[in-house]
Amino acid sequence: MMFKLGVLLTICLLLFPLTGTALDGDQLAEHMLDISSGINDRWFDPVRKCCMRPVCTCPCCS
C-alpha cells in the first residue's frame, strides 16, 4: 500500500512539478513598481540612474 502511494506521489510530482506553478497575476506589476519607485525620489538622478544622496550605499553610486 505504501509503495503504491509513493509511486503515485512520484508520478504526480513529475507531471506537476512545484517549480512549474504559475506566478500570481499581479506579481510582475508589483515588482515593476518596486523598480520604478526610485524615480519619484527627489534625490534620483535619471542620467546616472542612481540616487544623489551625500551618503549613499547603493552599488550604482560607489
Swiss-Prot record:
Leader sequence residues: 1-22
UniProt keyword Disulfide bond present: yes
Subcellular location: Secreted
Entry keyword set: Cleavage on pair of basic residues, Disulfide bond, Secreted, Signal, Toxin
GO MF terms, alphabetically ordered: toxin activity
Cysteine pairings via disulfide bonds: 50-60, 51-58, 56-61
Tissue: Expressed by the venom duct.
Gene Ontology cellular component list: extracellular region
Propeptide: 23-49
Annotated family: Belongs to the conotoxin M superfamily.
UniProt comment concerning the protein's domains: The cysteine framework is III (CC-C-C-CC). Classified in the M-1 branch, since 1 residue stands between the fourth and the fifth cysteine residues.
Protein name: Conotoxin reg3.5
Source species of the chain: Conus regius
